[in-house]
Swiss-Prot record:
Belongs to the UreF family. GO terms for cellular component: cytoplasm. Residues 9-21 have a biased composition (Low complexity). InterPro entries: UreF, UreF_sf. Required for maturation of urease via the functional incorporation of the urease nickel metallocenter. The keyword Cytoplasm applies. This is Urease accessory protein UreF. Residues 1-21 are annotated as: Disordered. HAMAP family: UreF. It is found in: Cytoplasm. Its main location: cytoplasm. GO terms for molecular function: nickel cation binding.
Length: 250
């Protein structure tokens, strides 16, 4: 029997060690993102519907099919896509520890909010997220970046900065962010009662491939790619401010 080549054995061991390290890194990324984007994370995501409450009141969202169509448009043409691009760029600022880039991105993200309620939705969640994450998951550079953003912080910017500072993979960040957005919207729809739990689960499953495709696109998209075309949602967010009966803040 031929003796094993020591060089080949060492190479195999090194490759196995690299694979193990990569798996450990992916598991760590998943654990952080699952914690940060969980409904239990103290950002108050449950209080916002991103215009969905008005859409249900107006009859735009009334069943499984209309909910799926509404959310597909919000993901593809609305704030969700913009947020994914902003989160990806904030990831770069967090990775580099670049406070100027963080400030510029935050100013841009807040300026993109089309109404008072949607501005509150992103700024309150972002501020809460950054404060909670700095306290519970400190990372080199993250606290310094947070001190440069003492006021309102856009939610995608806060999540992106934290993910970059913790060296989470960018694609994982963007995919997790979009998935959490979708899940929160469906959760709001369940409370508004146009769909039940089984229908909501089917909507999430049907839109998951779109989430993956948008994450791949947003990961490397330039800021020039920002833009939205969800006028019905934007106008509805204005009307929601004076809606007679409501349970959400947006």
């Amino acid at each position: 029997m031929d003796e094993a080549d020591p060089g080949e054995a060492e190479a195999a061991q090194a490759e196995a060690a690299q694979d193990g390290a990569a798996q450990d890194g992916a598991a760590r990324d998943a654990l952080l993102l699952l914690s940060w984007l969980s409904p239990g994370y103290p950002v108050g995501a449950y209080a916002y519907s991103h215009g969905l409450e008005w859409a249900a009141e107006a009859g735009d969202v009334r069943d499984e099919a209309s909910l799926g169509a509404w959310l597909a448009d919000v993901l593809s043409h609305g704030a969700a896509r913009n947020d994914a691009i902003l989160a990806a760029h904030a990831h770069g600022a967090g990775l580099a520890g670049d406070p100027r880039a963080a400030e510029a991105l935050n100013d841009l993200a807040l300026a993109l909010a089309p109404s008072r309620e949607l501005h509150l939705e992103t700024s309150q969640q972002g501020r809460s997220f950054l404060d909670a994450t700095v306290a519970a998951w400190p990372a080199p550079g993250l606290e310094a970046l947070a001190t440069r953003l003492p006021g309102p912080v856009a939610y995608p910017v806060a999540v992106g900065l934290a993910a970059g500072a913790h060296r989470i993979a960018r694609r994982s960040l963007v995919t997790g962010y979009l998935s959490a957005f979708l899940q929160n919207q469906v959760s709001a729809a369940l409370r508004l009662a146009p769909v039940g739990q089984s229908a909501g689960t089917r909507v999430v499953a049907a839109l998951s491939p779109l989430v993956a495709a948008l994450a791949a696109e947003a990961e490397g998209a330039p800021l020039d790619a920002l833009g939205a075309a969800t006028l019905r949602l934007d106008l509805g967010s204005f009307r929601h401010e004076t809606q007679y009966s409501r349970i959400f803040r947006s």
